[in-house]
Amino acid sequence: MILQQPLERGPPGRDPRATTGVTLGLDTREPLHKHFLSEENMATHFSRLSLHNDHPYCSPPVTFPEALPPLRSPCPELLLWRYPGSLIPEALRLLRLGDNPSPYYSASPAGEIMEL
């Protein structure tokens, strides 16, 4: 059982008792209203909930124009890209030692080679 004070109508964000300057004690307030929570009430509440966008508070779906034109001939090739941040330690080593730089996309160690 949940006990709750009745809602008071008035300007939003202001307590109507604050304008009159009257402070009421617990014994002079209006009686608390009882809200009984039962399994039936909860089942009814949850059965009304929905995961679909069929409620009036949902706006209709918006379609956006495509950012890229559709591909004329899509190809199944895979582009492997290596994050350039992994080359920072190599660049620092080259700056310290003055070595000749290796090719930008050098062969990876055997553990990193992938076959498709």
From Swiss-Prot:
Keyword entries, A-Z: Cytoplasm, Nucleus
| Localization annotation | Cytoplasm; Nucleus
Q: Where is this region: Interaction with HCFC1?
A: 54-57
Major localization listed first in the record, in broad terms:
cytoplasm
Domain of life, per the record?
Eukaryota
For this record, the Gene Ontology CC terms, alphabetical, are: cytoplasm; nucleus
A Pfam family that this protein carries is: HPIP
Q: Where is this motif: Nuclear export signal?
A: 88-97
Entry function? Regulates HCFC1 activity by modulating its subcellular localization. Overexpression of HCFC1R1 leads to accumulation of HCFC1 in the cytoplasm. HCFC1R1-mediated export may provide the pool of cytoplasmic HCFC1 required for import of virion-derived VP16 into the nucleus.
> How does this polypeptide assemble, per the annotation?
Interacts with HCFC1.
Q: What is this protein called?
A: Host cell factor C1 regulator 1
